[in-house]
Amino acid sequence: MLTKRVIVCLDVRNRKVTKGVKFKGNIDIGDPVEMGARYSDDGVDELVFYDITASAENRPCDMEMIRQIAKRVFIPFAVGGGIRNLDDMHEALLAGAEKVSVNSLAVLHPEIIAEGAKAFGRQCIVLGMDAKFVGVSDKIPSGYEVFIRGGRTAMGIDALEWAKRAEELGVGEICLNSIDTDGVKNGYELTITDMIAKAVQVPVIASGGAGTPDHIVDLFRKTSADAALVASMVHFGDYTVPGIKGEMLAAGIPVRKKMNGEV
């Protein structure tokens, strides 16, 4: 088994890290810069910064916040929310991000994936996908439908087919978030995660539902996902990144260690 990554997600609203359940009832938790620095020091493999109100407010991602976080973290750092065009991608990368995540924009304008991959390299382009189980039908053969605008708008697009098309267009990675399990802390949505991970060649990040290290172990034992994205379980102090990685190692799942050899 290849080394598996643990990624912490910082959903940011009004310059505060926030978290809700199934995209609703968000509460503010803390300062993104300080939290990002702490997770970086703790040995998390990557950070994801989502400016969750930027698209709805029709403004670019908070570039100044990206610059501040980039100065404090020494790990790969992806940003999303308010990425509206190639110029926004370029500015985010110049601000210190290694990757940019496109979600609603990519669904509405798929050509942005190919354009971004050509301009910056596919390793810089992450497809963020919000999916929800709606039942198997002729239109949605996998049973999982793509939603945009923070999970508010159903698109009538099958999640598995969209993942395969996005790979063809040039994404370097797919972050699959399950709306059904987001913030619930009862475990990841394994079915669609494994479907997509086995159907594409690019890395797949599972998002939505992690509540205990056992859920992460379960993810890697039962699917071909490359990384686990966590938020609530570390933001609220239930678990730490070193603790999560320690339990993964104990379960026989290889993890990346810090330069001093600690997990």
Model-derived regions: residue spans:
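Glycine/small-residue-rich loop that forms an oxyanion/phosphate-binding "nest" at active or ligand-binding sites
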Residues: 53, 61-124
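Conserved anion-binding
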Residues: 12-14, 18-19, 97-176, 180-181
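Catalytic cores of alpha/beta
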Residues: 73, 77-99, 191-228
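Glycine-rich, proline-tolerant flexible connector loops at the mouths of alpha/beta enzymes
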Residues: 46-65, 104, 175-186
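Conserved, mostly hydrophobic/aromatic
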Residues: 11, 39, 47, 79, ...
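Charged helix-capping and loop-helix junction motifs
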Residues: 60-67, 110, 156-160, 186-195
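Structural preference for beta-strand elements that scaffold enzyme active sites
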Residues: 5-9, 46, 74-78, 99-101, ...
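C-terminal helical cap(s) of enzyme catalytic domains, especially alpha/beta-barrels
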Residues: 113-119, 217-259
